[in-house]
Curated annotation (Swiss-Prot):
GO cellular component: host cell nucleus
Entry similarity comment: Belongs to the poxviridae OPG036 family.
Function, in words: Plays a role in the inhibition of host innate immune response. Within the host nucleus, inhibits activation of interferon-beta promoter by inhibiting IRF3 activation.
Single biological process term from Gene Ontology: symbiont-mediated suppression of host cytoplasmic pattern recognition receptor signaling pathway via inhibition of IRF3 activity
Keywords: Early protein, Host nucleus, Host-virus interaction, Inhibition of host innate immune response by virus, Inhibition of host IRF3 by virus, Inhibition of host RLR pathway by virus, Viral immunoevasion
Keyword Chloroplast among UniProt keywords: no
Induction details: Expressed in the early phase of the viral replicative cycle.
UniProt cross-references to Pfam families, sorted A to Z: Poxv_Bcl-2-like
Domain of life: Viruses
Lineage: Viruses, Varidnaviria, Bamfordvirae, Nucleocytoviricota, Pokkesviricetes
Source species of the chain: Vaccinia virus (strain Western Reserve)
Subcellular location(s) per record: Host nucleus
Name of this chain's protein: Protein OPG036
Main location: host cell
Gene: OPG036
Amino acid sequence: MTSSAMDNNEPKVLEMVYDATILPEGSSMDPNIMDCINRHINMCIQRTYSSSIIAILDRFLMMNKDELNNTQCHIIKEFMTYEQMAIDHYGGYVNAILYQIRKRPNQHHTIDLFKRIKRTRYDTFKVDPVEFVKKVIGFVSILNKYKPVYSYVLYENVLYDEFKCFINYVETKYF
């Protein structure tokens, strides 16, 4: 990479640094993961749906146990209930992923979450996007309790349209 290319991107890099989530002391996040998260947030902002829900979600995923227990935010309290949904849905897969993470803590893990497909009465299939996003949020929340760097799993597994449905659900329920 040439220095001129670096100079051209300097304002963008500085903007990403200032917008980056502050991590707990001693933890670090892979720049590729931050790029993935920032791209998703920028896409959401460009599509003009509420980025405040995304900010609340990102903050929730970085909160420690004491902060979660002392929160007054109803949205975060709802996000906390998603962990049990993830355990019920993914069960042994949660344990398998946690085992892999403990076994190789410094390795980047590719985590693909499956969707439960429901058969309609017209013999077609559908996935409830809101329920799927809830389960992914719960799954990521469980992973982040072990090490708070797994937020990228949310953005790698959830499509824009699914995320939009979830945002609409939260906005309708709380705003």
